[in-house]
Amino acid sequence: MKDGFLKAAAFSPALRVADCTYNAQQILEQLQAAAQRGVKLAVFPEFCLTGYTCGDLFLQRTLQQGALDALEWLLAQTRTLDTVALVGLPLLVHGKLYNCAAVLCRGQLLGIVPKTYLPNYGEFYEKRQFTPGSTEVQTVTVCGQQVLFGTSLLFRCRQMPSFVLGVELCEDLWSALPPSTFHALAGATVIANLSASDETVGKAEYRRALVANQSARLLCG
């Protein structure tokens, strides 16, 4: 952070549905380029390791394990990168499947944040496969690392104490009471929202207005 500013970037890589290896390679290429440009926070889309439109393939252990293998590979490849990266993947925890954001930096998993609000209308049917996240924090083992799991996690940077990161996923922001509201009340100064929202008439403008309004009310980036 310089003069109160943090260089952040949002990415939308070209993905292949259910091809976790390819998707991880695309993410790494963009992440390495971002790190070279001084980006300290890199946000990738919801389900970027698998693609959003996997449907009932999300329930297959092959895809779930493929996403974990891709995440483990990314961790190994980013050990020297001084950039916090957020990537989306499905994660099975105690027999329940969650839509998650993994927070990683320098080869370490800093935490896993599950999605709170699952859309189940129109073209969305996430409740068919996934379980809503809880504010209760628990410890899980992911890619051989003990990591905290829960919707209420905040991440404070030791080198930049004023950088406190809160995380939510897509529909969370569209809800009546977004998790980001509670993150800001708890001290978050930056909110990252991993999204895989589709495009319909007027939606892009509405989404920008939604983000701008929430950022203004919460006094955070």
What label would you give each PLM region?
Residues 1-221:
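Enzyme catalytic cores with a strong preference for nitrogen-chemistry domains
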